[in-house]
């Protein structure tokens, strides 16, 4: 069964969502992300994806206090991403209670450092973030496109020991128009042992069912929950 991973995106300490990574499209859903996390936990959710959008924009971890509060006031397994660009950022994330940390831009810009993290912390704790626009990897909070093609990028890191990947199709993210199932199928055909977490575009329970039927191991979503297109009760069949 597919793993359900709600997302909490944070700006100014608040729970927000963007559309296609556009910071100008910010919508605040809750002033208190800890309350959101506690509600998820009360409904059987075990895993949480926390994104520091301030961190992604400013190239260093910013909202670690929110992470710390979520980690201490719930028993959710938290993976954290956004602005993790240095050893110090990684240390802050783990010390603040993240069980796993996602690196995206750093894996493109400083592969030596990212591989060092993989060696030190292992593939259980380090997740590769592959944010994709037309099969190219995007960096810096999705503001810039790199020259990295998705499949060679993945193959390189899988050969170096990566096992967990969060793949976000930027064109779908926050648009509630359905996920890129064909892309994820293609990824799993090429890399059948990959623990792939699909992110972006989930609009209803049928999308999650379709991802599950496609063999996708995990799904990350937020806006569909916050907008009421999916209820926590709907998710019980997966939990």
UniProtKB/Swiss-Prot annotation:
GO terms for biological process: L-histidine biosynthetic process. It is found in: Cytoplasm. Signal peptide: none annotated. GO terms for cellular component: cytoplasm. Pathway: Amino-acid biosynthesis; L-histidine biosynthesis; L-histidine from 5-phospho-alpha-D-ribose 1-diphosphate: step 4/9. The active site is at 9 (proton acceptor), 131 (proton donor). Its EC number is 5.3.1.16. Keywords: Amino-acid biosynthesis, Cytoplasm, Histidine biosynthesis, Isomerase. The keyword Amino-acid biosynthesis applies. Its main location: cytoplasm. It is an enzyme of class 5 (isomerase). Pfam families: His_biosynth (PF00977). GO terms for molecular function: 1-(5-phosphoribosyl)-5-[(5-phosphoribosylamino)methylideneamino]imidazole-4-carboxamide isomerase activity. It comes from the Bacteria. It catalyses: 1-(5-phospho-beta-D-ribosyl)-5-[(5-phospho-beta-D-ribosylamino)methylideneamino]imidazole-4-carboxamide = 5-[(5-phospho-1-deoxy-D-ribulos-1-ylimino)methylamino]-1-(5-phospho-beta-D-ribosyl)imidazole-4-carboxamide. InterPro entries: Aldolase_TIM, His_biosynth, HisA_bact_arch, Isoase_HisA-like, Isoase_HisA-like_bact, RibuloseP-bd_barrel. Belongs to the HisA/HisF family. This is 1-(5-phosphoribosyl)-5-[(5-phosphoribosylamino)methylideneamino] imidazole-4-carboxamide isomerase. The lineage of its organism: Bacteria, Pseudomonadati, Bacteroidota, Bacteroidia, Bacteroidales. The gene is hisA.
């Amino acid at each position: 069964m597919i793993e359900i991973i709600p997302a909490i995106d944070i700006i100014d300490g608040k729970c927000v969502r963007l559309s296609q990574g556009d910071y100008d499209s910010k919508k605040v859903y809750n002033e208190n992300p800890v309350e959101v996390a506690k509600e998820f936990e009360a409904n059987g959710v075990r895993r949480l994806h926390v994104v520091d959008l301030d961190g992604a924009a400013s190239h260093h971890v910013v909202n670690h206090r929110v992470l710390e509060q979520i980690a201490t006031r719930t028993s959710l397994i938290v993976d954290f991403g956004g602005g993790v660009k240095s050893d110090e950022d990684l240390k802050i994330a783990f010390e603040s209670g993240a069980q796993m940390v996602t690196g995206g831009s750093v894996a493109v810009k400083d592969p030596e450092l990212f591989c060092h993290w993989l060696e030190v912390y292992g593939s259980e704790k380090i997740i590769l973030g592959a944010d994709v626009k037309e099969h190219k990897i995007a960096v810096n909070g999705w503001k810039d496109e790199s020259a990295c093609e998705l499949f060679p990028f993945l193959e390189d890191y899988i050969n170096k020991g990566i096992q967990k990947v969060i793949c976000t199709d930027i064109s779908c993210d926050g648009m509630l128009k359905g996920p890129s199932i064909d892309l994820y199928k293609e990824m799993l055909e090429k890399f059948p042992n990959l623990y792939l977490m699909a992110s972006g575009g989930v609009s209803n329970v049928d999308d999650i069912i379709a991802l599950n039927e496609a063999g996708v191991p995990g799904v990350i979503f937020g806006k569909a929950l916050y907008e009421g297109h999916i209820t926590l009760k709907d998710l019980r069949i997966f939990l």
